[in-house]
């Protein structure tokens, strides 16, 4: 028997609710005072329900049976003589089962006014704690609090496994003042799939993944996933304390860039990714043995297209499913720290893809992106550019950076494509871009965002490293923000990389005419805090591997590569090397398969790997190679003009009491005997490293491990020595005692 709708619903409210057009659902559904406070009424909308009883949660007693208003699932009824609100559940009889459902429409808003203010202002650092899907408890009831920013949507519902993806079942509470929609849902389980169903102002319906989801489905599926309640228990206190006390610009920093999906694979055909436990057991010991101080991970935020390598993320807060869950990732970072290895994360804040389930026109308007394509579309990648002028977008990005550093203990972020953020005309022709308020080409909003980001992160997370991939001559990338700089800790030295790799590809006979390509970088080495990077971008898209770039026979290729690494490790600046380069991978990188580890069955590849390992260990052991990386006093040319022989000689200095190191690099196959070099100290010297040693695959030309200085001034030094310079080789020479002071 049906009860007339007008007995419980305002005129037309029932019809609007059934049609999904009643947005202020909390004023209608749930428990409300009626009859001037002399009664309570409960209304609910449960499709396919046969009957509904109201049960007191406190004592489990049935309070009332609701009247069925119509066949579509509207129920309502008064609660006898009760006038004081109480917690209740709905006991719902369906054709095949009975369910107890804690009514979500009986709960007040769980949002905090301070959080809302900071989010709108653009300074929220923990927006992920109230946006997205978070486990909460209110009035003794546990559930998931769903919240999403969609100010221009007409209606937003949360849909998922728990409501059979019915968009009318869980319409969310709208906050008109700030554009947030929320709903606290009991009866939701860990691992439940969900999305947000949005009705745009034009009436269109679109289902979107949660922008703040911390877990997502495997592509091609794109549902968000309710996270687990259990959290990783950290054991890296010693590392975090050490990190906070370390001045990284004065410390050795040698990063191994890794694409987790192709470093190594498993399965009979190499078709399976390693999971985080595999990586703990295999990658960490390898990196430790090779002497790298850090791992830099290419992006691991969820991304649908493997070929993007992670640089087109859709789930910025969700660690990709490919290698395990969030707790697995935390365990991996924890294990890195316990092994004494830092871990940097590639972070994509310059753009986002147009996947329809993602951020694009999220609420029917250009919410996260600029509306004008001259500012909102990236022409190179056909992606969208964040609107850095919008407070909520800044909070979304700032909170995401904090999320990875706070919740996952990453030791820093490497920001991708910073140049594209800094300039409004980046990759655009005249007429395709809009000038800033002063008529210039600088993106003032993006610059301001980067300054705030770096300032906030360095303040909140002591000892982190913020690294910029920035390829232009933009001034002050690593200057502090109070000096009008961007505030990064380090900047990739793209100029050094391009020049040195170009030199590497020259025939040794003609390198004398391009000598400046290896010396020019010292003209600007102290204008920024540079990191020398040979990244994935240099060994892909037809560029070939490093070994492939080098002319000559195999012996010359391997010898040149070893000498090049010697020059790189001796040059001022921190280091980054892409995986596979450390053993001389022959093929260019392929993200769809493992590195060619079988090459290590061959001695030349073993030699390059051993050389890199020894360089790294020397780099960590000798302060001269890092403590004055960004001070002119830390480097001195002995001879930068010997283009005829293509030989480069220089000294690296540490602080008082640190042994200086002399580098001699020969970039031709010519052996030089009786070659005189200046030395900073008198006495005996030790040949610390010789890339031409037989153990590295060389011809064993050198100085038998020792060099003796004589009192003959040379190259501006009070003493010198005659040495043998091996072909295509690198020598690293230092005082045998290691303690005397240089002139």
From Swiss-Prot:
Catalytic machinery residues: 416, 469
Pfam families reported for this sequence: Alpha-amylase (PF00128), Alpha-amylase_C (PF02806), CBM_48 (PF02922), GlgB_N (PF22019)
Pathway the protein acts in: Glycan biosynthesis; glycogen biosynthesis
Swiss-Prot/TrEMBL GO biological process terms: glycogen biosynthetic process
Superkingdom field: Bacteria
Keyword Amino-acid biosynthesis attached: no
Reaction catalysis annotation: Transfers a segment of a (1->4)-alpha-D-glucan chain to a primary hydroxy group in a similar glucan chain
UniProt keyword annotations, A-Z: Carbohydrate metabolism, Glycogen biosynthesis, Glycogen metabolism, Glycosyltransferase, Transferase
Enzyme Commission number(s) from the entry: 2.4.1.18
Enzyme class: transferase
InterPro entries associated with the record: A-amylase/branching_C, Branching_enzy, GlgB, GlgB_N, GlgB_N_E_set_prok, Glyco_hydro_13_cat_dom, Glyco_hydro_13_N, Glyco_hydro_b
UniProt cross-references to Gene3D superfamilies, sorted A to Z: Glycosidases (3.20.20.80), Golgi alpha-mannosidase II (2.60.40.1180), Immunoglobulins (2.60.40.10)
Annotated GO CC locations: cytosol
Annotated GO MF terms: 1,4-alpha-glucan branching enzyme activity; cation binding; hydrolase activity, hydrolyzing O-glycosyl compounds
Family listed: Belongs to the glycosyl hydrolase 13 family. GlgB subfamily.
Cross-referenced HAMAP family: GlgB (MF_00685)
Role this protein plays: Catalyzes the formation of the alpha-1,6-glucosidic linkages in glycogen by scission of a 1,4-alpha-linked oligosaccharide from growing alpha-1,4-glucan chains and the subsequent attachment of the oligosaccharide to the alpha-1,6 position.
Assembly with partners or alone: Monomer.
Name listed for the protein in its UniProt record: 1,4-alpha-glucan branching enzyme GlgB
Organism: Shewanella baltica (strain OS155 / ATCC BAA-1091)
Gene coding for it: glgB
